[in-house]
From Swiss-Prot:
Keywords: Ribonucleoprotein, Ribosomal protein. NCBIfam families: rpsB_bact. This is Small ribosomal subunit protein uS2. The gene is rpsB. GO terms for cellular component: cytosolic small ribosomal subunit. GO terms for molecular function: structural constituent of ribosome.
Amino acid sequence: MATVSMRDMLKAGVHFGHQTRYWNPKMKPFIFGARNRVHIINLEKTVPMFNEALAELVKVGEKKGKVLFVGTKRAASEAVKEAAIASNQYYVNNRWLGGMLTNYKTVRQSIKRLKELEVQSTDGTFDKLTKKEALMRTREMEKLEKSLGGIKDMGGLPDALFVIDADHEHIAIKEANNLGIPVFAVVDTNSNPDGVDYIIPGNDDAIRAVQLYLNAAASSLTEGRNKDVAAVAEKDGFVEAE
């Protein structure tokens, strides 16, 4: 199973929290101390908590569960998309639209519209329109792709959320809580851990740290899915030749 060591975390800067004046007292159990007015996260807490979260993600993968990766700030955006694609999962990396989970019926209509426009752009429909109308539809399609492209093939609500920066993505976490969807989240010293089922206390700004969380999560999901495939193959009597 994919596990992350303290050495990996130190190298990525996972232990550097925010400035002490911005702290959230609810994060006190996960803070080791402060250095130069910056909180230091206790990695002796983070390592087992993160590895427990990864073990749970392996189980989600085994059940072919759908995981929605959420990270809309600049430091996380690209890495979130890459991790979701690498693990055949889904993502929101531009802006969280209120109601993305709690008002999924409306979101489904927008996804339907996006798919219609995608077909029109390739089947010659756009060519039959006036230049202005074609441009308007292209812009509409691009706008929808930007906000919904990562979930257009999700086909329903996710089984779990994996969030980078609990503070920044508090609306997504609240929606998941309302629907009983488990939340895995990186929670920095300035964030509120309430509503997070699997807390990963750590730096949520350093790109190397963000990539560490996401790569490990993607690997765990893929491992779980492959386990399931291997089990089915064994059951059916398919054994790969050496």
